[in-house]
Each structure stands twice: as structure tokens, then as C-alpha cells.
Amino acid sequence: MKILCVAEKPSISKAVAKILSGESTRTRKTRAKYIMNYDFKFNFPQYGLCDVTMTSVVGHITNIDFPPEYSWGKCPPGRLLEAPTLEVVSQQDVFKNIANEARTANILMIWTDCDREGEFIGWEILQAARLTNPSLTSENVLRSQFSHLERNHILHAAKNPLLLDLNAVKAVSCRMELDLRVGASFTRLLTDLFRKSSVANASMDKDKKSNVISYGTCQFPTLGFIVDRYLRVKSFVSEKFWYISVDLKMENDGEVQLVPFTWTRGHFFDRLFVTLIYQDCIANPFGKITKVIRKPTSNWRPLPLTTVELQKDCARIFKMSAKDALDAAEKLYNKGFISYPRTETDQFPQAMDLKELIGKQSQDTRWGSYCSELLHEGKYRTPRGGKNDDKAHPPIHPVNYANLSALDNDKLKKVYEYVVRRFLACCSDDAKGELNTVTLQWGKEEFTATGLAVIAKNYLNVYPYKKWESSKKLPNFIEGESRSITGGKMKEGKTSPPNHMTEPELIGLMDANGIGTDATIAEHIFKITNRGYVVKTKQRGTEYILPSELGMGLIQGFDRIEFENISLSKPFLRKRLENSLQEIVDGRTTKEQVLREVIQLYRQAFVQSAQKGNILLQAYKDIIDSNNNP
């Protein structure tokens, strides 16, 4: 019996073949660059000893497009919302290799990434195989389930395959068709509109990226977040406020210490109100210590690592873009060093042997001794569990040890070290401390002072990306004692504007609002940057994302049109689509139903956009004029 196995990437194909064959394969070149065919034998429990060929694709091998008669300029853009589509083979040599190898295969086993996109690529592989072997169908094609390249895990995946998830295939097909129809129709509409405008066209020539005004159902809500924050910063008007502060001079360990107390009411924007309270306070030369509370406190170790948290932390800690972080994680996964990096799961399965993974890291000079403490000194703790489980992959974690000096570049080193340290922190105890809170009553008002003493750093000893330090020790206050007020003052402050958008904030907003998935968020940010809709700028060492003139004009233009029951710049419609796609996966609705409903909404928006194109152009012109005449 012959079994054809197909992976999503050449590196995965090579690694899986090496494991299943016991490092004994016959390698054949193909006409497709980077792709090899590996021949070997493997004993499948249900089939016995089989001849196996392991090969791969390089992502998608087909895509959907419109027939030639619907190409740019040959039909009105609005026609694309209901025009026929056709499937096009985008990688002919890869497609033909699968078809040739499937000709003599009895069974097809899919080894693509275990997510929706991987499921659809598996379907594409099946279609290529059926070209020469119609006996291969969705009812008998096998699908391996794996999340990393550890030997026993791969052997288990080979021996316990499932079937393709056809609902996931339909969900991806639905998303691809909607992205094509909506993206192409609006892109052609906007581009034609702006090219015909002398003002817009002259401005766009400054940046070749802007010659095509590309629209995407995820990119525009993402851009909308950035524009919204920019406008909040720009329109911010600072307000004065007033508050009361108190300092007590105390002797502490032989030294005079000034202890600041904070007003429990915070601050007020009414100066007269605060003045009256302050006058009542200063009539009392003494204050009374009403409470002294000492209680244990903890700084919780992190939850197991998800894709979104990986991207946010790499942006915050290493100033690395979300795309660069995910690309580095993908390379580490392909090399077998970490688990699959696209996951929403923040809880480890109970049956997973985490101590074995810790043991593999014991040889490292940086964190090896810490691993030994976890394993041999009773410091290991079961990781906390979050609320999310995508049922496909565990949290991101190290699978095999990698010496940092052997990794190709700094980004790989930083991401690998972060993944390892995060994992070890998850398996550690929370940091422990004591929080000392003193309450002072001055007149009728209450003020508090706090002091933190860190007793045991625990996970913080291996996780340097978070700071939790002891504050200056508070003197020994006694409950009920009176103290002379040495520094009671009424002070003035003013409100500060919000900061412009940072990439970690943007990732969090996209995740919370259902814009894209954990796996595609980075790509959407990259696209709006590459298309010239936003620019990145550094201020005082922090990188912010600001809208360009074009990005601002597009969002404000769509907002001025005031669509009925829809917004092209807000996240609601895309979030609704993502929820509908999940319903397709769950079997609660159909691809056809979702297509009908969503296309109808976008059709209404398209008609209004076409009718009110002058509003879009005017919004862009207003932005240019305001920047030229500030």
C-alpha cells in the first residue's frame, strides 16, 4: 500500500520524513523549487508496513479570481460583488508534483498546519491529487493533527489521523470569496475616483504606494483605530485640576524620611471646592493615623503564551513589529525549536509533560540552573490556566533546546529566549511580597501612603521582562497616633492628552474587536503600513503609528458618507463576519447564507460610496489643506 503525505512547508516535510523514516529516506528532486519528495517505509497501525512518499506545498497552490471579461476597466466595479469566480492554479509545478505522486497512491494524508487555513490548503491538495486519482475523496483523505515537531508527538500524529474538517474549509472559502469581491470592487472604485481627481492625483504621485487605493475589510477598521486615536490627541484640550497632598517627616532607621500621602479623593476640576476643603484641613496642625494594614500580596506569573500576547510583548519589549515577531516564531517552529506559534489557547492540557520540556532547557548557561531549581528543589508549580482553548494547539512553548549562539539572527534569538523564559515563568510560583498601607486623617479628609517589600521574586528571577521592585520602606506608624503635618499643600495639575497609537495597543484593540485572527493581525498592520495609509514615528524612544494624509482622508471620507446600519471604518461589520465564519465551522450556518447577508450589506455601502464619491475626495482635500495651512 502506498500513502502520499503532503505538508504545508518544505521544512516540515523534511522534518516529518526524517522522524517517520528513522532518518532513512530516498530523496527525489522535483520541478518545484525548494520541494523534495522523500520515499521511505512506515508501519501504520491500521494499514501495516506501507510505502510512503512525503512531499509538500509552499502555502496555497490555488486562488480565486474573476474571468478575463471582468478585469479592470472591462466592467463597472460594482459588478464584482456578484460576478462569477473561477479557481486558478497559482503554483503549477507544485500542483503537478502532487498530481503525479497521487497517481499510484492508495491513501492521501494531509500534514498542513492545524488551523483553518491549513485545512483549506489540505482541500487544495486533495483537488490536485484527484486530478489523477479520483478515488481520493473528502470521505477518505486523512488529516494528521500536530502542533510541533517533537518525535513522539509526530509519531502519534501519524498513527492517529482524523478527517479533513469540511466546515473549516467552507469558512475559509467564504472568507476568501468575500475578501476578493469586496476588496476588488472597492479598490477599483476608490482608485478610479482618486485618479480622476487632479488634487488627489497630484498628491498621490508623491508616493507610488498610493497609486492604487487598496481596500480591505480588515485593513480599514485597523486604520480606523489609528485615525480615531490621532483625532483624540489632536482635539484634546487640557484642563486644570486641583488636589491636596500631605508629607509627614518621620524618623526611619536613624534618618529623617519625608513620607508622601495621596488624597483618597484624587483631584477635582473645581478650584473653589478644593480650596474650601483645604482651608478646613489646615485648621488642624495634626493628623491622625487611623489605619495601618500589612498584608501579603502577590505578583502573578504570566499565563501560557498565545499568538496575540507574543506579538504584543515582542513589540513592547524588543520594539519588533508584529509581523517580524510572528515570522521569527514561524522559523523557530519550522526548525523544531518551539510549538506551532498560531494559537489562541492559554491553558496547557493536564496530560502534557511540562517537566520533560523544562529538563531539555537545563543545559543552558543562562536559565539552566533555574530549571534545576524547578525540577529538583520543589519549586515547580502547575501553570495557571486562562479561559481560552482553540482545541487545535497548546500554548506556545519550547519543544527542543536551541543554543542562542547557533540561531541565525537577533530576532530569532530574542523570540526564542522570550518563549523559553515565558514558559519557565509559567511553571514557577508567583512573586511574593508584603504591602504596607497607612491611612492618615487630616481634618475630615483621608490620605494614604503605601510601601511594598518584595519577599520572594520567584518567577521574576527568570523573567526579566517585568519589573516588581520594593519601594522605600515606610516608617513604623502606630494606629491611633497623632502626627504633625509638615507639608500639607493644595496643588495644581492639568490633564494630559492620550498618546498616539502603539503597535501593542493596536494589536490588543484588533484582538478585542475581532479584526482578523491571531494569525492575521500582523499581516493587516503590515499592509496598511506598506500601502502608505499610516507612518511609524518615534517620540522619546517610543514608536507610534500615525495616519498619513491619505489614510486620514479615506477614513474621514467614509465617516462623512454616513451609511445606513454599517460603517466601513469601524470594526463591527468585520467582527460580525468573523463570528459568522465561526458559525460555519460549528455547523450553525452555511457558507451560502453568510455570503448573501454580508454581500448585501457591502452592496448598500458600495452604492452610496459610488454616489457620494465627491465626499471622499473633499475629505482628502480638506486634510491636505489643513496640513498646508495649519
What are these regions (language model features)?
Residues 113, 313, 317-321:
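A conserved hydrophobic secondary-structure block that centers on an alpha-helix together
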Residues 2-4, 163-167, 187, 191, ...:
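Basic, low-complexity terminal or inter-domain segments flanking catalytic cores
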Residues 1-188, 486, 497:
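Intrinsically disordered, low-complexity regulatory segments
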Residues 106-109, 155, 256-273, 277-278:
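OB-fold/S1-family RNA-binding modules
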